[in-house]
Swiss-Prot record:
Organism, scientific name: Arabidopsis thaliana
DNA-binding region ranges: 215-282
Described function: Binds preferentially DNA with A/T-rich content.
Taxonomic lineage from the root: Eukaryota, Viridiplantae, Streptophyta, Embryophyta, Tracheophyta
UniProt-recorded name of the protein: Putative high mobility group B protein 11
CDD domains: ARID_HMGB9-like (cd16872), HMG-box_AtHMGB9-like (cd22009)
Alphabetically ordered keywords of this record: DNA-binding, Nucleus, Transcription, Transcription regulation
Sequence ranges assigned to domain ARID in this UniProt record: 34-125
Record gene name: HMGB11
Region called Disordered, residue ranges: 197-221, 298-337
Database matches in InterPro entries: ARID_dom (IPR001606), ARID_dom_sf (IPR036431), ARID_HMGB9-like (IPR045303), HMG_box_dom (IPR009071), HMG_box_dom_sf (IPR036910)
Family affiliation: Belongs to the HMGB family.
Amino acid sequence: MSTDSSQFEVVPANASALDNDVSSHMSMLYQDIVRNPELFWEMLRDFHESSDKKFKIPIVGGKSLDLHRLFNEVTSRGGLEKVIKDRRCKEVIDAFNFKTTITNSAFVLRKSYLKMLFEFEHLYYFQAPLSTFWEKEKALKLLIEKSANRDKDSQELKPGTVITGIIDGKFESGYLISTKVGSEKLKGMLYHISPETKRGKKKAKSSQGDSHKPPKRQRTGYNFFVAEQSVRIKAENAGQKVSSPKNFGNMWTNLSESDRKVYYEKSREDGKRYKMEILQYRSLMESRVAEIVAATDAGTSASAAETADEASQENLAKTDACTSASSAAETEDEVSQ
């Protein structure tokens, strides 16, 4: 019996139709997942269990992260890779309206998505076979690394860099300003430094002491031991230039426990000193901020018209000055190495 060759020609047509049916089914399934939270959770749990992965909902801000919401927010913007490329992570974060401040929230959500949803996205959103997931995962890692380097470069501003900012208020010595660096919003103070101020700076510092600097951190018993040994070595070699030995660690190790107790006690006393001074320092800083805010409010109410006129001219103006920030904690070396 002869066979009509046309019988063989319907196979690719049927295969193509089958592919279309599968694609259409997966597309409908994704829409169902987006609309139906219960279906989403059921499928996500089954997906992880079938892959022998631990199914544990991340905790963010003290609450369980809504993975369904996260999946919808990311895929509605084209998937995780596109969100990172288009720098839209903040949009996703803002959609959650976290009541508490989440440290490095972009990293936390991205990590949660990678662990719980990225492979799920690959299968149900992009409708791609799991056999190709490793390629997408590798590409995303390179993108994240590139994005991190780009953000780092964009935020490393050198002294003298011109930035655009907004003047929020005015006080006796300068302005309260805000600016945006990358995706981060910053607030600070812009000071007028007159020649008289510069000349009197040294004198003022001697009269005020180091009240504007944070106190030195608590020293350890080992710190006290090294300081004592350095003094002893310099005294024994008076008149000679002697560098401190680098084997203080061995000397400390060879001390008996009873000998170390002397230095531990000094460290405890220094801890009391630090706690007292840090409280005083914080109180001083809070008072200074309150004074600046009060002066700003008073100046604004006294000369509202003048301030509004100046602000309208200077808002969004490019400045070539450096903003003053709170003093960073300074730790001085106890011993010259």
